[in-house]
Structure formats: C-alpha cells, structure tokens
Amino acid sequence: SGGFDFSFLPQPPQEKAHDGGRYYGVGLGPGPMGLMGPRGPPGASGAPGPQGFQGPAGEPGEPGQTGPAGARGPAGPPGKAGGVVGPQGARGFPGTPGLPGFKGIRGHNGLDGLKGQPGAQGVKGEPGAPGENGTPGQTGARGLPGERGRRGSDGSVGPVGPAGPIGSAGPPGFPGAPGPKGELGPVGNTGPAGPAGPRGEQGLPGVSGPVGPPGNPGANGLTGKGAAGLPGVAGAPGLPGPRGIPGPVGASGATGARGLVGEPGPAGSKGESGGKGEPGSAGPQGPPGSSGEEGKRSTGPTGPPGLRGGPGSRGLPGADGRRGPSGDTGRPGEPGLMGARGLPGSPGNVGPAGKEGPGLPGIDGRPGPIGPAGARGEAGNIGFPGPKGPAGDPGGHAGLAGNRGAPGPDGNNGAQGPPGLQGVQGGKGEQGPAGPPGFQGLPGPAGTTGEAGKPGERGIPGEFGLPGPAGPRGERGPPGESGAVGPSGAIGSRGPSGPPGPDGNKGEPGVVGAPGTAGPAGSGGLPGERGAAGIPGGKGEKGETGLRGEVGTTGRDGARGAPGAVGAPGPAGATGDRGEAGAAGPAGPAGPRGSPGERGEVGPAGPNGFAGPAGAAGQPGAKGERGTKGPKGENGIVGPTGPVGSAGPAGPNGPAGPAGSRGDGGPPGVTGFPGAAGRTGPPGPSGITGPPGPPGAAGKGDQGPVGRGETGAGGPPGFTGEKGPSGEPGTAGPPGTAGPQGLLGAPGILGLPGSRGERGLPGVAGAVGEPGPLGIGPPGARGGKHGNRGEPGPVGSVGPVGALGPRGPSGPQGIRGDKGEPGEKGPRGLPGGLQGLPGLAGQHGDQGSPGPVGPAGPRGPAGPSGPPGKDGRTGHPGAVGPAGIRGSQGSQGPSGPAGPPGPPGPPGASGGGYDFGYEGDFYRA
C-alpha cells in the first residue's frame, strides 16, 4: 500500500511510540534483543498506481466433447378425444364464392362428381379499389415434434434407358387394389445417364387404399405393422402407458431381388395430379472445391484486457425426440384410357358450396425426450502475465508521534532474539565493588509513568532482505476499478466467409385490407385474327421510368379459358422476393474439425509471481433443483465489435442439416467451397445465438458434378434463429451456349411500370371459356414490377383437359442474360394439395467434430463491486532485516516512592561461637 511495514521485526523491550503501524525505539543503552512485539495495524493505503499494460492473449483452448445424452422427459398429457367420422358425401357443383368462413373440421374426401360443360365467356369487370390493410394475426403456438422414425435402407438406382415413343391413349382402367409394399433393394452404383426421353402424359390418380389401424407394438418397444383394415370409428384415446425399454435393434433382413422392368405401356391421357410420392434419399455430395489462398497472418497490437467471465448459463434443452414411423400409403391405380372428348354443353347451374365434413382431430403428441447437454469445453491456456506497471507513488510521510497510550499488560517471555548491533558506549562511571547481598524486599508500587522521550531520528533503511515464503492466499477482495481501455488493434486480414447464419424470425402478417368496391363491367371484345409473324427487332434501350399511374380498381376475374397448346419454353423470369422467413430448422450436426491455425508468436514473459500454497479442495455442493423457466429477456444492446483477428485456414464445411423454412430474402451470398462429406452426427443442442460475424470474402468454388439423389425425408421444423448477416453478391457464372431461335410473336406494347397496388379482395371465379387460338409473336417488353401479394381467390371451375402435345427436345442452353431488377412479390398461389404422409426419418449419423472456436465477443460493462473480502490469514514472517541505527539515549525518569519492607531473610551462617548454660538457660558466645 505504498510503503513497507517492518513491524514484524524484533523490537527491544523499551518504550515505543505508535504511528500508523511503525515503531520508533527510544534506546536506554545496549541490551539483549527483546521479545517480538505484536503486529501493528496495517498502514494507510497509498495512491493507486497507473494501469499496467495488458499481456498478450493466450491461445484458445481445445473445444470440449459432447456430453452424454440426457434423460428422457416425462410423458405429456393424453390427447383430446376426436369427433365422429362424417359420412362420405358426393362432390357438389361449384357454387358462387362467398366470404371466407371459419375453417371446419376436415372430413373424408367425397367422390368426384361429374364434370360440367364449360360455360360462356363472362365479361371482364373493372378492377376494384384497394382496401386498407387489416390487423396482423397472432402467431399460433408451435407444436412439439413427434418421435423420429427409423430410416429404411436406400433403394438402388438403375441405369436410365433410352426414351420410348409416346404411346396412344388407352381406355381408362379401374383403380387397382393397393399392392404390397416391396422391400427396398440394396444401394446400387449410379448408372450412366441416358438421353432424355419425351415426357409422358400423367396418368389419372388412383383411389387410395384404406389405411389400416396401427399394429401392436413389437418386442422390446419396436414398432410393428398391422395389416391394412377398413377405417373404423375412432374411440377415445386411452391414457398413455408406461414407456417400454427400447430393445436392441435387430439385424437388417435380406433384401429381395429387384424385379425386371417391363415394357413401357401406352401413355394415358393427362389426369389430375396424383398424390405426392415418398421422398427419395439424398444424393452423394460433390467433391470439395479447390481451396483459396491462405491469408497471411499479421499480428495486431494487444487488445484491452477482458473481464473475467461469470459462471456459464444453463444449457438449452436438447432436441426433441424422434418421430414414429407413419403407416403405409396406398398405391395409385393404373392410368385409365383417355375417352373421347365431349362436345361443349350449356353452362351448368351453380350449385351450393360443399361443406367439409367433420373429421377426427389427432391426439396430441407426447413431448420427446430432452437431448443431451453439451459438454463444457476445456479451459484455454493461461495467458502470459502482462508487464509490470510502474510503481505507484509512495504513501504519505510519517506522522508525528501521538500521545502515549496506557501501558498494556505484560506479555509472556518470548524467545531471545538475535543480538543487535553494538551501540556506542555512553559515559558510564566506573563500577564499584559489589556489596553483600541484601534481603529481598517486597515489590514496591509501580512508579508514575515517565514522559515519553523524543522520537529518534529515522534511520537509513537498510537493504531489503530476501523475500520469505509467501503466506497462504487470502480471500478475494472487492474487484478493483476497470483499467483504461488499450488502443484498438489493427484490423487483421480478412478470414474466410463463415457459414450462412440461421434464418431470421418470421415477420408478422400484414394488415388485411378493407373490401374494395367493384367497378362497372366492360364489354367483351372479339378475338382478332392471327397476325403474321414479324421480324424480331433488336434489343431496345431501356426507357426512362414513366410516371406512376393511378391505382386501378380490382376487376372481377374473367371466364377461364381452356388450356391452350403447350408453347415453347419462355425465358426465365426475374427472381422474386424471398418469402417471409419460416421457422429455422434445428441446428445441423457439427462439421468436421478444421485444421488448427498457426500458433501465435510468444509474447514477452512477465515477472514471475509468488506462488502461494494450494488451498484445500472444497467439497462439491449438492446439485440444485431446476428452476422454473423465466420470461424471455429482451435483446441487449450490441456492444462494439472487437478487432478482427488474423484468419486461420478455413475448415471444410460440414454436411447440410435438415432444410428449414424459407427466410427473408437477403442478397445472394458468396459461393463457398464444398467441404468433404462428413459423417452425419446427432443434432446437438441449440446453442445461444452469438453476434453476427463479419462478412467473408467473395470466393468462387469449382462446380462439382451434378449429383442425382432421391429427395430425403423432411426433418422437423427447427427453432427460429436470428437473421444472419448478408453475404456479398456472388459473381456471375460463365455464359451458356446459345439456344434455338424461338417462334416470332406480334410485338407487344411497352407498358409503363405499374404502381405497387394494395392487396385486393378475392375475385369471383368466372365460368370456363372456350380455348382461344394460339398466338405467335416475339416476346413482349418487360412489364412492371410485381404487385403485392394478393389474398388467395376462390378456386374456379375446372375446365376440360386439353390434349397434351408432344414435348419437343430440349435446346441448348442460351447465353445468360443481364441480371434483371428483382421483382416484387407476385400474387399468392392457390393453396397446394393435401400434405403427404411424413417419410421415414433417417438414422442419426456419427457425431461430427466440434467446430472451431469463434472470436471473443465485445467487452461487456463492468460488473457491480462485490462485498468486501474477509481479512487474510497471517502471513509467514519475512526475513530479519538489518539492525537500525541506535537511537538517542532517553532521559531518566523520576524515582518512585519507597517500597514496603520486604520479608525476613534467611538465617545467617554460624559465627563460630559456642553454647553454654547458666541457671538452666542456654546461651551462645
């Protein structure tokens, strides 16, 4: 504390003046070394010294391994009882669309009704006025994913044969019964791709076979399969029984032989879209691209010292359990023969809108087990201590001696200390001869206290002795003030681009607009004659942006025309805006461990600290109970980004995780190098989202061979991650070969860019019109930007299916055109078909190596001062310093009063006389 305390040195048994922990002796002549006095209180603290320089940071520690899997969580509550299955109704005629009502419970699909004849073409109305946006709806709670099913073996892919001729349409056949599901064959080598054959017509969908009830559970908790039975009335779900102990997985059965491929039959007419097929397995991963140049390593200046981190937060709950396997789906029937095309009839009457029958709501799934918590990584190496700061200013000067306190009680006799230095001999008189010993008197009363002598002059401090052994480490004191922040380090070389961040949170839906008014109906025009083929003109210059037109009112949909003949494929349109971000998929398995970076240069070694003896290890405390889940905290303010460190070599990319929902559209990222395919590991627990990393440099990877794999099963939706940083725009690809000259069309009128219209109400579906003539003309000028996404309109009447023309051979790839302006979101498409049954989930792969440790985050604010620490234990006494200069001789105090008489002394020795008797008495002479 700005000075040294020599109070532990042996002091002579003489009067002492106390001053702030320092003792000044008043000599009374040379004598033997006295007892060691008690330790004085600590001196006043000196001013704090300036901040020392920060030492270089230590190397990061190796990442830890993943811990064992956690215990399975408790079973969830039983599901709700389903309703009664509704009867299977006939399909009604399409009615006029009403206002969208509440969605009813879905019933069984009804039988398809007879297809009506197309009606006359309706008059196209004026567009209606845009409505105001409504209030956004609340996002519903997300359900828990079920248990994941086991993955089946991959089927073999045979060689692609030559394309067969297009057969004539055959008569429609009856739907066949669902055949037995064949065994999956072994994985074969991918054969060479044959020439692309003409596209066959799509057959009519077969009637799905009835789904049988689930089979009894197999031995050791394995899921069994029962025979497909007729659907019965669903009873109320029972309480979930105790979970069985999963038994060992049996060996895979022998794979049956693959049947011969029959002759291709005649192609049937194009029917309605069939059910969604089961997803195939993923194809092999392409070879890794060539690595870019390794960045040069530059050592920046040392950053400011980081605060000591507190205890880590509790790990997030693990991933949900696996979903059970789904039942078998019925096989589609054989395509029927195409019947003769009927004559167009009169438009049918509009029937009432069909209602959905009541369906059975499924029982709620039980929550899966909590995944394993990640193991704590190994501690990093201890950094080198920084250079010692300059010494602080010395403490205040020694104060004047205070008044002497009352004398304390006598201490016990201590061991004799080492003799002090010989003092200067005073002017002492000669000593006379010793007198006879007198009787020992009683101790007299204590004399009055003499006045304190003047403090002697301060001696010159001697050289410091060797430091003694360090005492035991005291308890931790309150934290000191934070040091000054050091200068920012130089920006290091740019590191390789990191993997894309998780998808951002899904935005809330926009406000629903108010209904607009319908405009007056316009007159229907007659189709004009087919124009002659014009000569294609040269590419015109881009015109200036026109004035924004007034917002038109939304018109009613005109009558739907019959599908025309298939035209030549047009040029690819501009890429639309990305959809709103869906929920992110679960964290993919960790990629293989990257190669270690170059070891940093060793910083200057600091002075060696004094090593204290190790304290006794404390007993581990009892494991605390798990607390309740607290409310979600708000995101804190992002601190300043620290300096970018030097880039190590980039590790290979890990295998792709399950696909998450579509996120917000960012600019196209840079194409990274494909990493070597690692073995897929089990999904680890979702980590805490870190701050966004710096954007990586633009790299261009070599294009790998096109893999042809079957589509893998979709994984369960993962947790929503924060929006990752936008990558730099990618480089344009090489130009392709020129395509064939397309048919010429009539020149289109260049329209002004339309204004971005508001979302309109769903229009009324018109009647189906006759197919119009196929126009031929050059492609028209580019239209304006897409408008906002509109509400889904009602489904119109299905027109008659036109004859499908033969597909022409694919032409060579044309030269890639200039990148167009990104279009706005187009109108929302019609809702898709029924969701297919989930495919069987794949098995967990081997656990991947942990990824590299990310850069350290910005320095957080200083924490609150802790409570003051307890006094440390007494340290070991230091080495004995040299004796100080002898103080001046004090003045003698006044004599005390005479003491009381002492006790009688012992009898003296005999004087040599003799005894004699006289008149009966004895006398001694």
From Swiss-Prot:
Sites bearing 5-hydroxylysine, chain numbering: K103
Biased composition (Low complexity): 35-74, 154-171, 281-291, 363-379, 479-496, 508-518, 551-595, 602-622, 640-650, 671-680, 719-753, 761-771, 791-806
Comp. bias intervals (Pro residues): 897-907
Subcellular location: Secreted; Secreted, Extracellular space; Secreted, Extracellular space, Extracellular matrix
Tissue and organ expression note: Expressed in bones.
Biased composition, class Basic and acidic residues, residue ranges: 623-632, 816-827
Major localization listed first in the record, in broad terms: secreted
Stretches with biased composition (Gly residues): 22-34, 271-280, 306-315, 423-432, 519-528, 660-669, 696-718, 772-782
Domain of life: Eukaryota
Keyword Protein transport recorded: no
Keyword DNA-binding (UniProt): no
Coiled coil region boundaries: none
Keyword annotations of the record: Extinct organism protein, Extracellular matrix, Glycoprotein, Hydroxylation, Secreted
Post-translation changes: Prolines at the third position of the tripeptide repeating unit (G-X-Y) are hydroxylated in some or all of the chains.
Residue positions the entry lists as glycosylated: K103
One cellular-component annotation, GO: extracellular matrix
Region annotation (Disordered) ranges: 1-925
Family matches, as Pfam families: Collagen
Family: Belongs to the fibrillar collagen family.
UniProt function note: Type I collagen is a member of group I collagen (fibrillar forming collagen).
Subunit-structure text: Trimers of one alpha 2(I) and two alpha 1(I) chains. Interacts (via C-terminus) with TMEM131 (via PapD-L domain); the interaction is direct and is involved in assembly and TRAPPIII ER-to-Golgi transport complex-dependent secretion of collagen.
Note: These protein fragments were extracted from an ancient mandible bone collected in Haiti.
Protein name: Collagen alpha-2(I) chain
